[in-house]
């Protein structure tokens, strides 16, 4: 049967026009804890069983699952539902919390990424709507709780990727300070894997004050724009993409001051946007992250390799390496 290219184009246009519903539907399933329910059950579940366990009525649940099965998230056999390798990545221990954060009004608001917002430069959602800073508005407590849970989940996954794919990064290190380390999830996982390392979780005093104790991790409060605790290495995991180039250079200079001039290094764990068409499996996701930054953060962005090199040169680093860790992030190691 001949392929009607015009029909294909129209179908593709409809897919783009409606594509936002893909993540919306998946977020609804995560909110209903369907991936965790199926995982805990350990086998096939009927619609009635899944409805009872999730608290969602049969008819809307059926339609939701029909959509997600069509898109390859879950599987179905003999009118019963089951996990797939993909849906397992959306349990509470994986990307589930990140999906919930992306579903909050702050993240999803069309005010963030609109033509008008881009023209006026008010891409930060709360600034464009209320003239307030997203980090300090108490009315957005729900978003911030979801954000915190998402960052914990992300830290676990990224630390695991480093342990699996670049353990040599910690060879010879006695101490590592995680700048913006919040409650120490990432550095805690890394210290577990590399017990000869003393970890330091460094964040604002009000954040580290609530941190639970972690073996091998010290918590230090402070301001990364003023000084960074001294260590053999400094790690910046998903920190610099929040800031403008000028602010990133300030942060990097403070990190450079905190490490030994002859043996220290700064480890930047962040996305690198690919612009040469070669890329990898995560190239599209990295571009999507940049659209989120464009919508939510006034100054932040994901950067290309050339843009990262510019920051490192301006901050006074003499050399650097880049390591692919089979993740949405890479590890950039910068040396004084």
Curated annotation (Swiss-Prot):
In which family does this protein belong, per the annotation? Belongs to the class I-like SAM-binding methyltransferase superfamily. Cation-independent O-methyltransferase family.
Tissue expression as described in the entry: Expressed in leaves.
Pfam entry (one): Dimerisation
ATP-binding as a keyword? no
Q: What happens after mutating residue 111 to T?
A: Increased ability to produce scutellarein-4'-methyl ether (SCU4'Me) from scutellarein (SCU)
Residue numbers binding S-adenosyl-L-methionine: 140, 203
A molecular-function term among this protein's GO annotations: protein dimerization activity
The pathway that the record names for this protein is:
Flavonoid metabolism
Q: Which reaction does it catalyse?
A: scutellarein 7-methyl ether + S-adenosyl-L-methionine = ladanein + S-adenosyl-L-homocysteine + H(+); cirsimaritin + S-adenosyl-L-methionine = salvigenin + S-adenosyl-L-homocysteine + H(+); cirsiliol + S-adenosyl-L-methionine = eupatorin + S-adenosyl-L-homocysteine + H(+); genkwanin + S-adenosyl-L-methionine = apigenin 4',7-dimethyl ether + S-adenosyl-L-homocysteine
What is its biological role?
Flavonoid 4'-O-methyltransferase involved in the biosynthesis of polymethoxylated flavonoids natural products such as nevadensin and salvigenin, aroma compounds which contribute to the flavor of sweet basil, and exhibit pharmacological activities such as anti-allergic, anti-oxidant, antibacterial, anti-proliferative, and anti-inflammatory effects.
Q: What is the effect of changing residue 181 to S?
A: Reduced ability to use cirsimaritin (CIRM) as substrate but unchanged efficiency toward scutellarein-7-methyl ether (SCU7Me)
Keywords, A to Z? Methyltransferase, S-adenosyl-L-methionine, Transferase
Q: How is it used?
A: Nevadensin is a selective inhibitor of human carboxylesterase 1 (hCE-1), a key enzyme responsible for the hydrolysis of a wide range of endogenous and xenobiotic esters.
Q: What PROSITE patterns has UniProt attached to this entry? A: SAM_OMT_II
What organism does the UniProt record list as the source?
Answer: Ocimum basilicum (Sweet basil)
| Active site (UniProt) | 241
What is this protein's record name?
Flavonoid 4'-O-methyltransferase 3
| Ways its activity is controlled | Substrate inhibition by genkwanin (GENK) at concentrations above 2.5 mM.
What does the record give as EC number?
2.1.1.-
Alphabetical GO biological process terms? methylation
How does this chain assemble? Homodimer.
């Amino acid at each position: 049967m001949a392929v009607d290219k015009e029909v294909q184009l129209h179908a593709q246009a409809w897919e783009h026009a409606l594509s936002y519903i893909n993540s919306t539907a998946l977020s609804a399933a995560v909110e209903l804890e369907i991936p965790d329910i199926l995982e805990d059950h350990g086998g096939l579940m009927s619609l009635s069983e899944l409805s009872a366990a999730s608290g969602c009525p049969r008819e809307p649940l059926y339609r939701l699952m029909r959509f997600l099965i069509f898109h390859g998230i879950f599987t179905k056999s003999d009118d019963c539902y089951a996990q797939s390798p993909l849906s397992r990545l959306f349990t509470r221990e994986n990307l589930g919390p990140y999906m919930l954060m992306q579903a909050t009004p702050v993240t999803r608001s069309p005010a963030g990424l609109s033509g008008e917002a881009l023209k006026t430069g008010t891409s930060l959602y709360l600034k464009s709507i209320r003239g307030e800073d997203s980090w300090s508005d108490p009315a957005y407590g729900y978003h911030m709780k979801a954000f915190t849970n998402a960052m914990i989940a992300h830290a676990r996954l990224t630390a695991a990727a480093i342990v699996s794919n670049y353990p040599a990064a910690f060879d010879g290190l006695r101490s590592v300070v995680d700048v913006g380390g919040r409650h120490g999830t990432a550095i805690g996982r890394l210290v577990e894997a590399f017990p000869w390392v003393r970890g330091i979780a460094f964040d604002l005093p009000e954040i580290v004050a609530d941190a639970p104790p972690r073996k091998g991790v010290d918590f230090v409060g402070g301001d990364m724009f003023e000084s960074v605790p001294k260590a053999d290495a400094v790690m910046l995991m998903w920190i610099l993409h929040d800031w403008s180039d000028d602010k990133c250079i300030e942060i990097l200079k403070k990190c450079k001051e905190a490490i030994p001039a002859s043996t220290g290094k700064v480890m930047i764990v962040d996305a690198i946007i690919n612009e040469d068409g070669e890329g990898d499996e995560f190239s599209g996701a990295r571009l999507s992250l940049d659209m989120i930054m464009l919508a939510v953060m006034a100054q932040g962005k994901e950067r290309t390799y050339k843009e990262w090199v510019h920051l490192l040169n301006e901050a006074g680093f003499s050399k650097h390496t880049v390591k692919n860790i089979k993740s949405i992030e890479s590890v950039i190691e910068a040396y004084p």
